[in-house]
Amino acid sequence: MGRVIRAQRKGAAGSVFKSHTHHRKGPAKFRSLDYGERNGYLKGLVTEIIHDPGRGAPLARVAFRHPFRYMKQKELFVAAEGMYTGQYLYCGKKANLMVGNVLPLGSIPEGAVICNVELHVGDRGALARASGDYAIVIAHNPESNTTRVKLPSGSKKILPSACRAMIGQVAGGGRTEKPLLKAGNAYHKYKAKRNCWPVVRGVAMNPVEHPHGGGNHQHIGHASTVRRDKSAGAKVGQIAARRTGRRRGAAATLAAKADY
């Protein structure tokens, strides 16, 4: 009988494969949407730019005055390129179009570069949050109160115009362009995230450890496609693949055009 394979062990979410979240600074979110942001603006001060282990983009600690009490509200924002300690940020419908300010999509002109975009009104930021990412406002539809946005993947999405976004591009762009050069650097990179490195190929394993393992030379030995309802220990390879192999003919031509 074979062993419990790596994919099954990861799915069980045991202590070995849990994300290393104990040293992270906290969730990076906008302020909770309130009356002040819907109708005017609130002023905040960037008190610190910090590194968050396990995240590529830096974070900004922003202090706001509480709208009703004599106290300060401290928030963690994903930092935009060009933000600095001591900068004043403005969040709300009537805020200016400046890097780091947070406005609803309906108040942002077409062609503007934005980041940390809400997917649903009040969800406090969901799209274009990785280091160097940005989205672009394409068009507004005043009849349906929606805005068309081009995402970092290149896909275009229609969002409610009341969704908020930060002006600018996420800081930390070009982080992945520097080569790791040695295994030790990769080890420390992934140690801050989770246990997902190094990745051993299935064909390099013994047959007891993986369905692709074993043999006098490294080969799968059977079709690598598996059906969707396959048992967990055999569900490896190309799962429920519609097709395999490189595209040929008209399909390849259409795919090449879509890349440009």
Swiss-Prot record:
InterPro entries tied to this protein: NA-bd_OB-fold, Rib_uL2_dom2, Ribosomal_uL2, Ribosomal_uL2_arc_euk, Ribosomal_uL2_C, Ribosomal_uL2_CS, Ribosomal_uL2_dom3, Ribosomal_uL2_RNA-bd_dom
| GO CC, one annotated term | cytosolic ribosome
So which domain of life are we looking at?
Eukaryota
Name any one GO molecular function.
RNA binding
Q: Where is this region: Disordered?
A: 227-248
Q: Which GO terms describe its biological process?
A: translation
| Pfam family of the protein (one) | Ribosomal_L2_C
Signal sequence span is none
Task: List the keywords (alphabetical).
Answer: Ribonucleoprotein, Ribosomal protein
Cited NCBIfam families: PRK09612.1 (NF007180)
| Family stated for the protein in its record | Belongs to the universal ribosomal protein uL2 family.
Q: Please give the name of this protein.
A: Large ribosomal subunit protein uL2y
State the gene name recorded for this protein. RPL8B
